[in-house]
Amino acid sequence: MIDTQQLRAEQLARASDVIRHDDLPFEQPAFIAGADVGFEQEGSVTRAAIAVMRYPSLELVEYKIARISTTMPYIPGFLSFRECPGLLAAWALLEQKPDLLFVDGHGISHPRRLGVASHFGLLVDVPTIGVAKSRLCGRFEPLTESVGSQQPLLDKGEQIGWVWRSKARCNPLFVATGHRVSQDSALHWVQSCMRGYRLPEPTRWADAVASNRPAFVRWQRQQAANVLS
């Protein structure tokens, strides 16, 4: 039996440690990574992928996938406890640690201000940004249909993120401070990693690596061809 009251208390305690201003060891990062977590075998296996990209070229330079036994069932509002063990396993495999990490999920845009981007950022002490595809909490004014339309995401009088339309005719992204990155900088860095898709390149590639999508298959073929040439 999962003690959600204990987990809730831990979330609140950890959330108080999140650094919400810029505490960045760079003027421009050399490497930005994306992280994505999924589940296999009816949820019994956690699959975590991290894709590291050189910045600003956004060239994929390293990726790692970790598969571990899932340690916790799905409980709404406590997803980071389920996802962080897999992310830690993938992180440990990386040879090139990134200067900045985008996580597919929420940062402080969480009812208790501890989404997976914030939780993981605290665990590894790296600047993180939450890039979520759906809203978990908070309210925002309607966006226009124009690319670049944005509104603050507000909850209980506090800005907890940005709602930003990254691509025409697509639902907006929910971008938020994870750890050691301010709200405005979080949006800036996500915007700087766009290449015409709905998702920024780091999390788009993390998803591609995790799911063996065509873009990643083509990249692997090109790498193999480069070795042979």
Swiss-Prot record:
Q: Could you list the residue ranges forming a coiled coil in this record?
A: none
| Catalytic activity as recorded in UniProt | Endonucleolytic cleavage at apurinic or apyrimidinic sites to products with a 5'-phosphate
Cell compartments where the protein resides:
Cytoplasm
Which top class of enzyme applies to this chain?
A: hydrolase
Biological process (GO) annotations held by this record are: DNA repair
Record carries keyword DNA damage: yes
Q: Which EC number applies?
A: 3.1.21.7
| Binding residue positions for Mg(2+) | 36, 104
- Gene Ontology molecular-function annotations: deoxyribonuclease V activity; magnesium ion binding; RNA endonuclease activity, producing 5'-phosphomonoesters; single-stranded RNA binding
Q: What is its main location?
A: cytoplasm
User: Keywords for this entry?
Assistant: Cytoplasm, DNA damage, DNA repair, Endonuclease, Hydrolase, Magnesium, Metal-binding, Nuclease
Names of the cofactor(s):
Mg(2+)
> Could you tell me which InterPro entries the record lists for this protein?
Endonuclease-V
Annotated site (Interaction with target DNA): 74
Task: Identify one Pfam family in the record.
Answer: Endonuclease_5
Q: Where are the transmembrane segments?
A: none
What family does the database annotate?
Belongs to the endonuclease V family.
Protein purpose: DNA repair enzyme involved in the repair of deaminated bases. Selectively cleaves double-stranded DNA at the second phosphodiester bond 3' to a deoxyinosine leaving behind the intact lesion on the nicked DNA.
| Full protein name | Endonuclease V
Q: Which gene encodes it?
A: nfi
